Amino acid sequence: MHVTAITMEDANFPYRLGTDCAEELVARLGVRAASRYLVVCDTTVAALYGHDLVARLEKDAGPAVLLTHQVGEVHKDVTTVGALAEQALGAGADRRSVVVALGGGITGNIAGLLAALLFRGITLVHVPTTVVAMLDSVLSLKQAVNASFGKNLVGTFYQPAEVLADTAMLRTLPEREVRSGMGEVVKNALAVRPAMADRLAGLLRPDARYDDDALRWIIAESVAAKADVTGADKHERGDGLVLEYGHTAGHAIEHAARGAVAHGAGVAVGMVIAAEVSHRLGHASASFVARHRELISKAGLEDTVPACVRTDDVKNWLTYDNKRGYLDCAADTTPMVLLAGPGRPLRTGGMPLVPVPLAVLNETVDALAAPGRAGTDHRTAVPV
């Protein structure tokens, strides 16, 4: 496995990336000499990889137990974390146990918060199984779950000891989830690492079919992009906030969709909304907005608010964005990451956030509603 040293201020951990490397992955976990391996995954990943990983660990590393949670964003909450904690303690977890987060971003957050809370903190190792997790969520110290008022509002910061990524696990990933991951890749190219954009444009596939070489390049570039901004900002409260590009409207769309819209798909639309807002406010050019649409289309993602979502709901959730409080904003504004051009975030007092009038943001959301539907009519949720 290729090793990249991740440094976020005083937080350091290795990111190991390979293909068809299950034996090496288990060997790396075995080095931890855990009293018990607590493998956390959802019920789908349990059937694909969870039972096999537990069996391999039992054979070659030490005692292991599988802790499962239900699939979906609606289960990413404190209730799930509490239930898993009870299961872990009932299975004999102690301070020398290791939490293995086997899955995508939802599982990573659930398991990360679990590791931070058990005995006030035990070892956490990420084994990501989705594109979003491999190139984005496992590279953050943020471990959070949702509340009824919005996404990622309850959590803490907690460092993983290691990331072990095997691209072979992406072969079972539904096309919807692969496209979702590419939404975050496009974000990296637009907001953080514009030098990767041209090659990325040639690699992106609307059919979501990528070979291992392409995936390794995409993941490695995205890891480097995230490291560029978190190296001196481990809590992502300064320059690291640029990684929130597209997430203000993206999170609102996800929440309004009640799980029917994948994270990266929401972020993709959120980026177009942010670009259009920046253009309306006189900062971004029309050609830069078009570049957003080009890359998003090449990734097989939509660039309008999905028809399954009521725009009135999106506008409501925008007022609960988790970046509120970073800036002293008027009641009729909300803080957003906006770009003036590739890799050029607008700033307020050195921070890559600007107050955006809610009237302009809401008008843009309405303008980007999927054709043929009003903002308040009701639709059946269809996954995107």
From Swiss-Prot:
GO terms for molecular function: 3-dehydroquinate synthase activity; metal ion binding. It is an enzyme of class 4 (lyase). Gene3D superfamilies: 3.40.50.1970, Dehydroquinate synthase-like - alpha domain. It catalyses: D-glucose 6-phosphate = 2-deoxy-L-scyllo-inosose + phosphate. Keywords: Antibiotic biosynthesis, Cobalt, Lyase, Metal-binding, NAD. Its EC number is 4.2.3.124. Pathway: Metabolic intermediate biosynthesis; 2-deoxystreptamine biosynthesis; 2-deoxystreptamine from D-glucose 6-phosphate: step 1/4; Antibiotic biosynthesis; lividomycin biosynthesis. Its cofactor is NAD(+); Co(2+). Pfam families: DHQ_synthase, DHQS_C. PANTHER family: 3-DEHYDROQUINATE SYNTHASE. Catalyzes the intramolecular carbocycle formation from D-glucose-6-phosphate to 2-deoxy-scyllo-inosose (DOI). This is 2-deoxy-scyllo-inosose synthase. It comes from Streptomyces lividus.
